[in-house]
């Protein structure tokens, strides 16, 4: 019992020390301003070493790795067994007796903060299963039963008054209950402090051992405990007052330090500004002087360059004046002489001008006659597109080729005309209209045919084509009828290109039927375009020659 009471007292002393320590830590943390943060050192990054090649590994390195692996496995198993000791009390005893350094390791772990906080080192084991304790408890219970035969089996609970933070209850139990409870190991948690892991809340219930203690000793211990608690409460009040005074003093000193540092900072800022201003002014003066010196050098260089240029210009002007003076003297000499050579030169120049004028007139007359011949031949070709007089047409084509051999575009157009003449006669406007009328009827008949139509289908198309188009409401028939009308209107306006485009927009069968008519239109359009190209090139060449002469 005395041993267990000493354990309780040691727990109370630890409680007081940790209360003092936690109080000072919390007071210092509260006194710090919110801007202050704890400095956290950044971890040094781990730079892995370059791996060695697998081919260069020796037997010693393999043995070293195996040894390290076995060592790590042994340490891991040893640490796991230490952790399991705090879970199973039987394994705790076995580990302490049969494992090397078992007792020392378990004791150190129990006394460390890890044992108190995580492994249950703050629990006090009350093991009443030993035979000596059982014999003592049986003897004491027999004596108590013989002396108290008239008393009841269970006494009333006696409580000792404690301060608000601690109450210990002493309960007398019968021997049968104590025997049952003595066979098990009882673990009770004292409670954990947030910082150290020590118990600060509860006291282990050691009812069996307290039954065997003397009442006077229990009272003495309780009085001592009450006095120690009263002292602790008084110390707590004093500490709270000291803490308040220290907080007030710290705040006052903090304000003084802040004001002092602000004044120092302002003085440093003013001194820095003055220093910067003086440095700026000195640098400004230095740069101004440097810039002025450079400007003076540049001005001197430019002045020398300009002076040399002026001298050169004056010399050039003097030379030109001398040349003009010599020319004027020569002119006066020539005028005064009036020799025959001068008159003969004038006559020669006038004769050359007359020759050039005659040449120009002859060239102009030839060009005009050539243009007249070209225009006449083109008019004849345009009038006689049926080529009734084929020999005359060929003569016209030959004259065109000779007249347009110098112009590439006109020569190309004349070759096109020659190909068209060789291919045969060209249809005129009336013939194209008559052929288009018959073609439009055939195209209209194809609207009622399909790709699989036979003899009866063709008869049906002939009959239906005789009916008016308003009877049919099919969009295909309406579109074909509209396309034919557009082509007819373009043909009446002499727009062969528009009529050909309209027919090409039809489907496959109508395009196949209108192929010959489209080819005839194309030949006529090619002939007309070639004639227009030759006329345009002739007029352009004449205008260019006139412009050159002008």
UniProtKB/Swiss-Prot annotation:
- What is the predominant subcellular site recorded for this chain? mitochondrion
Q: How does it sit in the membrane?
A: Single-pass membrane protein
Keyword Metal-binding present in the record's keywords: the answer is: no
One cellular component term (GO) for this entry is:
mitochondrion
Membrane side Mitochondrial intermembrane: which residues? Answer: 87-550
What keywords would UniProt list here? Coiled coil, Membrane, Mitochondrion, Mitochondrion inner membrane, Transit peptide, Transmembrane, Transmembrane helix
Transit peptide located at: 1-38
Specify the domain of life of the species encoding this protein: Eukaryota
The family database entries (Pfam families) matched by this protein are listed as: Mitofilin
GO terms under biological process: cristae formation
Any coiled-coil ranges, and where?
214-275
Q: Where is this region: Disordered?
A: 35-59, 128-158
Query: Which residues lie in Low complexity bias regions?
Result: 132-147
Spans through the membrane: 67-86
Compartments it resides in:
Mitochondrion inner membrane
The biased composition feature labelled Basic and acidic residues covers: 148-158
Q: Which residues lie on this side of the membrane: Mitochondrial matrix?
A: 39-66
Keyword Cytoplasm among record annotations: no
Tell me how this protein assembles.
Component of the mitochondrial contact site and cristae organizing system (MICOS) complex.
Name-wise, this protein is MICOS complex subunit mic60
């Amino acid at each position: 019992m005395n041993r267990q009471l000493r354990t309780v007292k040691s727990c109370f002393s630890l409680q007081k020390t940790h209360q003092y320590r936690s109080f000072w830590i919390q007071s210092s943390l509260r006194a710090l301003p919110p801007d202050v943060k704890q400095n956290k050192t950044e971890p040094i990054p781990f730079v892995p070493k370059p791996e060695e090649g697998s081919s260069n590994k020796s037997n010693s390195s393999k043995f070293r790795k195996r040894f390290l692996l076995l060592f790590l496995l042994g340490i891991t198993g040893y640490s796991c067994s230490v952790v399991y000791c705090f879970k199973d009390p039987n394994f705790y005893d076995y580990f302490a007796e049969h494992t090397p350094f078992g007792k020392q390791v378990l004791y150190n772990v129990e006394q460390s903060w890890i044992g108190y906080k995580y492994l249950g080192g703050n629990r006090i084991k009350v093991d009443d299963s030993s035979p000596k304790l059982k014999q003592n408890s049986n003897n004491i219970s027999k004596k108590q039963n013989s002396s108290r035969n008239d008393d009841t089996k269970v006494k009333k609970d006696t409580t000792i008054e404690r301060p608000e933070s601690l109450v210990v209850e002493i309960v007398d139990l019968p021997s049968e209950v104590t025997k049952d409870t003595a066979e098990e190991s009882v673990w009770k948690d004292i409670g954990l402090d947030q910082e150290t892991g020590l118990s600060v809340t509860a006291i282990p219930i050691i009812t069996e051992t307290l039954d065997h203690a003397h009442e006077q000793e229990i009272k003495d211990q309780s009085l001592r405990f009450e006095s120690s608690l009263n002292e602790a409460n008084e110390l707590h009040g004093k500490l709270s007052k000291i803490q308040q005074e220290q907080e007030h003093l710290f705040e006052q000193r903090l304000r003084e330090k802040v004001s002092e540092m602000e004044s120092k900072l302002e003085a440093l800022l003013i001194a820095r500004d003055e220093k910067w201003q003086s440095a700026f002014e000195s640098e400004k003066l230095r740069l101004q002087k440097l810039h002025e010196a450079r400007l003076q050098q540049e001005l001197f260089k430019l002045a020398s360059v300009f002076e040399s240029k002026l001298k050169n210009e004056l010399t050039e002007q003097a030379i030109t004046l001398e040349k003009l003076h010599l020319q004027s003297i020569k002119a006066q000499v020539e005028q005064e002489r009036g020799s025959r050579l001068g008159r003969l030169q004038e006559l020669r120049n006038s004769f050359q001008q007359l020759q050039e004028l005659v040449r120009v007139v002859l060239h102009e007359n030839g060009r005009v006659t050539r243009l007249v011949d070209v225009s006449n031949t083109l008019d004849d070709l345009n009038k006689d597109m049926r080529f009734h007089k084929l020999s005359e047409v060929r003569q016209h084509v030959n004259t065109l080729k000779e007249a347009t051999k110098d112009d590439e575009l006109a020569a190309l157009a004349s070759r096109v005309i020659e190909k068209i003449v060789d291919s045969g006669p060209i249809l005129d406007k009336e013939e194209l209209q008559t052929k288009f009328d018959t073609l439009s009827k055939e195209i209209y008949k194809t609207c009622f045919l399909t790709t699989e139509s036979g003899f009866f289908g063709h008869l049906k198309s002939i009959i239906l084509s005789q009916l008016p188009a308003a009877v049919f409401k099919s969009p295909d028939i309406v579109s074909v009828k509209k396309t034919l009308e557009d082509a007819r209107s373009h043909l009446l306006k002499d727009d062969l290109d528009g009529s050909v485009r309209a027919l090409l927009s039809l489907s496959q069968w109508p395009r196949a039927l209108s192929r010959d008519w489209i080819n005839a239109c194309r030949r006529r359009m090619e002939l007309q375009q070639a004639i227009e190209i030759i006329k345009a090139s002739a007029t352009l060449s004449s205008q260019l020659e006139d412009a050159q002469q002008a």
